[in-house]
Amino acid sequence: MSEQAKAPAEADFSRIRTVPVAARANKVRAADLCRPPGADRSFSAFIDSLPDILQARSFRAVVDAIVAATRSGRGVLCMMGGHVVKTGLTPVLIDLMERGVITHLASNGSAVIHDYELARWGGTSEDVEAGLADGTFGMAEETGREMNEAIRRGAVEGRGLGESLAEALDARRDLAHPELSLLLAARRLGVGFTVHAALGAEIIHQHPAADGAAIGQTSYTDFRRLVAFLPRLEGGVVLNLGSAVLM
């Protein structure tokens, strides 16, 4: 090894070929930038003020697609996870169903657990960290018992999972907030609501009243109902909200 270390190699840029800026296609133009809000503080003015770039452009495209699908009588499928419910967006979805915009709901089991608890007792979303520490996470007696009993009845009667839970809620007269339930709204409006369970991944599955066969049967019925709806999506829209895995 020589006493004098060699200098690190450096790339030679002398043969690089550049291109004129005028010949380059740009993804962002001056006209695409946002505009500060003026005197008009309406929501439509806010949307119009957004930049025509990336997610703002995508958001406008989604809105336009939903409007076009609704006006032409096409299907709008809203697939969702539990966070859509637990972060307080239920009233918006119910409003969209009432307006005839959302024509089918599909969710995992987490979403209907939160929906059931909100309608039944007016609260949901336990403290996971504290519950794991003392072993009580997912151990709510009434939630697990009532929902599993409804699913078992639904399996015997050939119902889907979503239909079974909606019927169980509808039969009760002691609900804290029935007006906040997606299950009840879908039942009232005749909007399909299919539930696609992940066996072993939802808190009611560890309850002694859980019946894996009943959960699987009713969820499979809902899968078939979802597939039967899919032809309506020709020219329609599929939304996936808050479910990065199951839906």
How would you label these PLM feature ranges?
Residues 2-156, 163-247:
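Metallocofactor- and cofactor-centric catalytic cores in central/energy metabolism, strongly enriched
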